[in-house]
């Protein structure tokens, strides 16, 4: 029995069911109209486990990256080593590097240094050779520093000077022997230096300045070539020799008269010779003008003048 008063109807349930279905259709249509094309779907359910795991991994990676950036290189290295031992096993001694084959810049320069570089040496340049060549370019190659400790065996060692030695005057104003600081009585020597370098025999002509004692050591077996200063000699006009006095003396009156006559005659002769010389010079200059262009005189450049000046100053 449905309804009130004991009356029931077969159409009452159908009307109620039809109204609810219409409402549902309207809500679905309204939602479709109100949704935007780029709007994401609503998750009414719990997220999938894989989605949650990806979010957690991303957050953990962000935190780990932040901590690694805050560390320095050594701290990062120790952390990675500890993590490797923790997760994969092993001993800490396995991660210690051997320093037997380590080389410093000084070791590389000693292995690849050359006393003189030529074009063949610069053909195949590795980073070791470039480092040695860069050091070679900083050396001053005017005078050498010598090692005369084995002079009795006729064995000598030579090297170029560094900037500190050039500033202090070692090898130029002081003795060029590395164990001597004498600055008096220095002499310049030119030595043909024969040496073996990288299995190849070479020769080089070097200059050095030594004191008297060190010069004796250098020339202990045979004498080397000494460089002497070549100063320009000043041109001096030869003076006329005085004529010897005559033994026979004339009286003073005759000598006075003769002196006057000789003075007048010599003055006239000198004037005539001057006039003739002036005329000859004028005629020669006029004739030379028509022969051709004037010969070019070789003038010394400023660098050559400085070289001559310093050569006279230092030697």
Curated annotation (Swiss-Prot):
The modification N6-acetyllysine is found at residue 36. The modification N-acetylmethionine is found at residue 1. It is found in: Nucleus. InterPro entries: Folate-sensitive_fs_Fra10Ac1, Histidine_acid_phosphatase. It comes from the Eukaryota. Interacts with ESS2. The modification Phosphoserine is found at residues 9, 12, 283, 285. The lineage of its organism: Eukaryota, Metazoa, Chordata, Craniata, Vertebrata. The keyword Mitochondrion does not apply. Keywords: Acetylation, Nucleus, Phosphoprotein. Residues 1-28, 225-308 are annotated as: Disordered. Residues 236-245, 255-278 have a biased composition (Basic and acidic residues). Residues 225-235 have a biased composition (Basic residues). May be involved in pre-mRNA splicing. This is Protein FRA10AC1 homolog. One of its GO terms (cellular component) is nucleus. One of its GO terms (biological process) is mRNA splicing, via spliceosome. It comes from Mus musculus (Mouse). Its main location: nucleus.
């Amino acid at each position: 029995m449905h309804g009130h008063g004991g009356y029931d109807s077969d159409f009452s349930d159908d009307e109620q069911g039809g109204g609810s279905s219409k409402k549902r259709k309207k809500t679905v249509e309204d939602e479709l109209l109100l949704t935007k094309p780029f709007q994401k779907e609503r998750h009414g359910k719990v997220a999938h486990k894989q989605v949650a795991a990806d979010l957690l991994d991303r957050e953990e990676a962000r935190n780990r990256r932040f901590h690694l950036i805050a560390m320095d290189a050594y701290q990062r290295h120790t952390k990675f080593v500890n993590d490797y031992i923790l997760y994969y096993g092993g001993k800490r001694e396995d991660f210690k590097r051997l320093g037997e084959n380590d080389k410093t810049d000084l070791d590389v320069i000693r292995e690849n240094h050359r006393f003189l570089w030529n074009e063949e040496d610069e053909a195949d340049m590795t980073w070791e050779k470039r480092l040695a060549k860069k050091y070679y370019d900083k050396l001053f190659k005017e005078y050498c520093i010598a090692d005369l400790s084995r002079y009795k065996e006729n064995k000598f060692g030579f090297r170029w000077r560094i900037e500190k030695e050039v500033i202090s005057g070692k090898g130029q104003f002081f003795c060029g022997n590395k164990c001597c600081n004498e600055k008096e009585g220095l002499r310049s020597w030119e030595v043909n230096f024969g040496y073996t370098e990288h299995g190849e025999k070479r020769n080089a002509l070097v200059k050095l300045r030594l004191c008297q004692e060190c010069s004796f050591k250098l020339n202990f077996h045979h004498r080397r070539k000494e460089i002497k200063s070549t100063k320009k000699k000043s041109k001096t006009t030869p003076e006329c020799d005085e004529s010897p006095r005559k033994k026979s003396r004339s009286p003073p009156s005759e000598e006075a008269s003769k002196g006057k006559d000789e003075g007048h005659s010599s003055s006239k002769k000198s004037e005539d010779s001057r006039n003739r010389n002036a005329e000859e010079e004028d005629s020669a200059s006029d004739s030379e003008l028509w022969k051709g262009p004037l010969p070019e005189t070789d003038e010394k450049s400023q660098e050559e003048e400085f070289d001559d000046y310093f050569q006279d100053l230092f030697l």
